[in-house]
């Protein structure tokens, strides 16, 4: 009889939850700070509100539209590769957003690139990894914990972003966030090491 997926000890489960929660906290936390950049960026580049609003609307559209694709890639190539690719795209999108001087550039970076990257480093891919790592009896609870971490990231990053913008300006803050997005790479590696162990465990039972 096969064991349930990832019948891991409590310590391993705690580590899995910590890595998954941190990934979602970083990704969702940064995502929910973008409204703070509207006024300073619009004033700097002499944009009307519609330019920035369109980029954020496009970001939301891309996030939703690419989530099934991110899930497919995670199934086909593994969650680690998707998380790494999404992390790189997120960082590149934030960097490009900092240097965007036209509405088209903003739409391409803050809209298309960041929106697509978020589908690969938020709930769809992370929850898929949890489904393979966490025993079925605790799976719903684990997903609730990670979802709460995303909400905490939103709560935490708003005042952090506000302070950074006040001290470093919007440009410097986007550079800091670009570097922060790269943290998803090592966190993703740490999370998905458990996927390899779980697969090996299932193969031996």
Q: Can you annotate each of these PLM segments?
A:
Residues 10-33:
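Pair of pore-lining "gating" transmembrane helices in MFS-fold secondary transporters
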Residues 32, 60-68, 154-155:
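Residue-level signature of mid-helix packing/kink "hotspots" within the transmembrane helices
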Residues 36-64:
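Extracellular/periplasmic helix-loop-helix junction of adjacent transmembrane segments
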Residues 65-104:
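Conserved MFS/SLC helix-loop-helix module at the cytosolic interface between two early adjacent transmembrane helices
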Residues 87, 91-94, 109-110, 178-185:
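A generic transmembrane-helix signature of 12-TM secondary carrier transporters
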Residues 110-148:
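Cytoplasmic helix-loop-helix junction between adjacent transmembrane helices
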Residues 146-197:
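Helix-loop-helix hairpin linking two adjacent transmembrane segments in secondary transporters
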